[in-house]
Structure formats: structure tokens, C-alpha cells
UniProtKB/Swiss-Prot annotation:
It is found in: Cytoplasm. This is Regulatory protein RecX. Belongs to the RecX family. Keywords: Cytoplasm. The lineage of its organism: Bacteria, Bacillati, Actinomycetota, Actinomycetes, Mycobacteriales. GO terms for cellular component: cytoplasm. Modulates RecA activity. It holds the Pfam family RecX_HTH1. The keyword Cytoplasm applies.
Length: 173
């Protein structure tokens, strides 16, 4: 004996169901902020009331958490890209994270840790450089590399000059 299956639904899914499906597809690729998802829904033409309802539901079940997103983003970008606090704050702001959340997440990074990370980046690049008598080219490249990662000009120059001197001393031995 076979059980009969109910006939497939011929009605279209509601706008809210479509919006939820879109958000879930986007969230399977990577974590996203509430603002990112809201922007994608708006781009697809979903009304604000539908977007708000869907995003509130996703936040209630824990699929959207801007504070957790910001924490993971900072850890990942500091470890893999060597970004400074200033660059991380700009990236999070672009992603739509609230300023209070950004401030609290970045409060855990002190100036000493920032300097240590800059030194690590410079050391790793210096190992592959050939040092000539004129350090201007190497200095310019290393300071530029740190500047692109958001480090201040002052810190970048200090770190590069100190690490360049240390590398010269190490190679002499």
C-alpha cells in the first residue's frame, strides 16, 4: 500500500519566504552583517517591512549577529592581512557595523600589539629583500606596505628603520 503524497503547491512563495531564502543563501557563503543583508534585499526590490521582518527573525535565531561578525572579522583580518585598527574600523564601517560595536571590538587591541604586528610584517618582508647600500628603495616599499594596511606614517617609519637596522646587524653576523 502506498501513501499518497499531497500535490505540490502551485502557489508562489510569499515575498517574505523569498527574502528569507535569499538571506539564507547569502549566509551560507559567508557571515554577513544586518546592513549587508538589508542592502541586498533592497537591491532586489523587497520592501522595508518585509526586509525588517526577515532580518529580525534571522537575528532572533542567531544567524545574524553584528558583534560576533565584527569580532571574527577583526581576528581574521589581523591574522591573515595584518590590518591595523584604523583599517579594520574603516572596513567594519563599510560593512554597516554600528560604531559602538566597532569601538568595543577594537578596544581589545592595544598600541603594543599593533606595533608588534607591524614589526612581524616588516620582518617577514625583509627576509626576502636584498639589502644594498641604499636602503631608500626598501624603506619606501616597506613603509608603503604598512601604510596600505592602515598603519600611521610615524609608526611605519619607526618600525621600518628599526627592523632594517636589526636585519643589517643580523646579516653581518
Amino acid at each position: 500500500m502506498t501513501a499518497s503524497c499531497p500535490p505540490p503547491s502551485t502557489s508562489e512563495p510569499s515575498r517574505e519566504e523569498q527574502a528569507r531564502a535569499l538571506c539564507l543563501r547569502l549566509l551560507t557563503a559567508r557571515a554577513r552583517t544586518r546592513a549587508e543583508l538589508h542592502g541586498r534585499l533592497a537591491k532586489r526590490g523587497y520592501p522595508d517591512d518585509v526586509s525588517t521582518a526577515v532580518l529580525d527573525r534571522l537575528a532572533a535565531v542567531g544567524l545574524i549577529d553584528d558583534a560576533d561578525f565584527a569580532q571574527q572579522w577583526v581576528q581574521s583580518r589581523r591574522a591573515h592581512a595584518g590590518k591595523s585598527k584604523r583599517a579594520l574600523a574603516a572596513e567594519l564601517h563599510t560593512k554597516g557595523v554600528d560604531n559602538d560595536v566597532i569601538t568595543s571590538v577594537l578596544a581589545g587591541i592595544d598600541a603594543g600589539a599593533e606595533r608588534d604586528r607591524a614589526e612581524q610584517l616588516v620582518r617577514s618582508k625583509l627576509r626576502r629583500e636584498t639589502l644594498a647600500q641604499d636602503d631608500a628603495r626598501v624603506t619606501r616599499r616597506l613603509v608603503g606596505m604598512l601604510a596600505r594596511r592602515g598603519y600611521s606614517q610615524n609608526l611605519a617609519c619607526e618600525v621600518v628603520l628599526a627592523e632594517l637596522a636589526a636585519e643589517r646587524e643580523r646579516r653581518r653576523v
